[in-house]
A protein has these predicted regions:
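A membrane-topology feature that recognizes alpha-helical transmembrane segments
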Residues: 1-211
Length: 211
C-alpha cells in the first residue's frame, strides 16, 4: 500500500506541475502541458508532496488503510489549493475523483460510520454557515468549493476534526488578511476581493492532523 501511495504521489506531483497556470487563470479550466514541468517553482510541489508522504508513512506505519485515506485527502486538498489560488475555483470532479477511493478504503477498513458522520457534519455545519451568511449579510462567508473540501476532510476524519480544521483555517485566514489590509489600506478594494480559503484549510489540516 505504501508503494501505491508513493506512485500516486508521484503522478499527482506530475499533474500539479504540468498545469498551465496562465490558462487556468484566464479560462478557469485545467490544461496540462509537459513543458510546465520544467519550471523551477514546481520543485516546491515535489518537496511538499514528498515530505508529507514520508511523514504519513511514519505516522501510519502500522495502518496502511489510514495512510492511504489521509494521503488521498491531502493530495486532493493540495490540488484544490493550487486551483483556488490561481483562479478562485474548486473543481467538483477533482473532489469526486478522490472521494470515491476514500469511501472505498473507509469501507475496507471499517471506518465508514465515522467517515459518513464526519461528511454529514461537514456539509451541515458549513452549509448552515454559508446559508446564514447569505441571508443576513448578503454575502458568502466562504464559497461552495470550500464546503466541498471541508466535507472531504470530514469523510477522511471525523466531525470534531473537520470542525477544528475549519475554525483554525478561518482564524489563520483572518489574521493573514488583517495583516495584508494594514499594508494595503484600500478598504473598498479589499472588501470586494475574493479570498482563496483552501490554502489555509490545507495549512490547518497539516497542522492539526499531523503535528
Amino acid at each position: 500500500m505504501y508503494f501505491v501511495g508513493g506512485i500516486l504521489s508521484f503522478f499527482v506531483c506530475l499533474f500539479v506541475s504540468s498545469i498551465d497556470l496562465n490558462f487556468l487563470n484566464k479560462k478557469e479550466r485545467i490544461k496540462v502541458s509537459i513543458r510546465n514541468i520544467k519550471k523551477y517553482y514546481n520543485l516546491i510541489n515535489f518537496i511538499i508532496i514528498f515530505f508529507v508522504n514520508l511523514y504519513l508513512i511514519s505516522l501510519f506505519l502500522n495502518n496502511n488503510v489510514l495512510y492511504i485515506i489521509n494521503l488521498l485527502c491531502f493530495l486532493c486538498i493540495y490540488i484544490c489549493s493550487v486551483t483556488d489560488i490561481i483562479c478562485k475555483n474548486i473543481f467538483l470532479d477533482i473532489i469526486l475523483s478522490f472521494a470515491c477511493p476514500i469511501i472505498f478504503f473507509n469501507i475496507y477498513g471499517n471506518y465508514i460510520k465515522i467517515s459518513v458522520f464526519g461528511l454529514i457534519s461537514g456539509i451541515l455545519l458549513y452549509g448552515i454557515i454559508y446559508i446564514l451568511s447569505r441571508l443576513f449579510y448578503g454575502m458568502e462567508a466562504f464559497g461552495i468549493g470550500d464546503i466541498y473540501v471541508l466535507s472531504l476532510i470530514g469523510l477522511s476524519t471525523d466531525w470534531y476534526t473537520v470542525f477544528n480544521i475549519g475554525l483554525f483555517a478561518f482564524v489563520i485566514a483572518g489574521i493573514f488578511y488583517f495583516v495584508k489590509y494594514i499594508f494595503v489600506r484600500k478598504l473598498q478594494t479589499f472588501k470586494h476581493q475574493e479570498i482563496p480559503l483552501v490554502p489555509f484549510i490545507l495549512f490547518s489540516y497539516l497542522i492539526l492532523i499531523y503535528f
